[in-house]
Amino acid sequence: MASAEWLNLLETCPQNSYLDGIWLIAVHIPALMQNIDTLTLNRHSTTTAAFTVALVSLDARVGAVGTALDNWLEGYQHEHNISDGLGLYWSSTALPHSTNIALSPTIDFATKTVASMMMTYWTHKLELAILREDIYVLEANPEGTDANDRVGAVIANAYDLASLIIRSATYWLANENVSIHVCMYMLIYPYRVAWAWFARRSKLYAEEISACRNIRARLLAGGFNTRLSEFVLDQLYKGPPE
């Protein structure tokens, strides 16, 4: 879906109709997923600058989903004449603010469930993109200053991705503790990327595998869903596709 279409959809979303808000979210989410898939699959043939531009576009689409969800919740509150109730942690800017919205248990549960599924899917897509970027850097230029500089850029990108996820998490997750958990989870990425690079340079594959599996075990112990971690680790061992 083109950016202009996204903007047109946002502009036509009624502020006082939560049903239209639900429809808009249903339109945005599939396009967002497609954008993530394209970004991940094309990572190996994309320059760092182009990838950064793609991330900015992705961030805008995440914002569109958040705006649509905001409209839906505000419409629900307006149509049902609700002015107080369940306090949800919500953010449309870098600084969060509180909004009191009363939701039925069914709607509240469904919203959190869908949000958690999307967050898990997106997190692992980005994890795969980060690890693949590190691999392609090594294959392209395993020696020299240029390789070191590019690996440094990869680690910086990991922090950028962490910031992107943390900001976007507040759109989808109505639980501050979950957002904090995502933040802590993302802090592991720079370590993983750096360790993967040093492990490949020094052929320490056993230590690399052990470190990644230990991290995954700690994440599982913390309750974070890492169903795709084995697939991600497999990609790390295999290197770039043919």
Walk through the language-model features, giving the residues of each:
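Intrinsically disordered, low-complexity regulatory regions with latent secondary structure
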Residues: 4-12, 92, 108, 143, ...
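Long amphipathic alpha-helical coiled-coil segments
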Residues: 128-133, 141, 183-186, 219-224
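Residue-level signal for secondary-structure boundary elements
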Residues: 15-18, 22, 41-44, 81, ...
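Structured alpha-helical bundle/scaffold domains in large eukaryotic membrane-trafficking regulators
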Residues: 74-88, 137-145, 174-180, 203-206, ...
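Central/C-terminal regulatory/activation regions of fungal transcription factors
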Residues: 1-140, 148-163
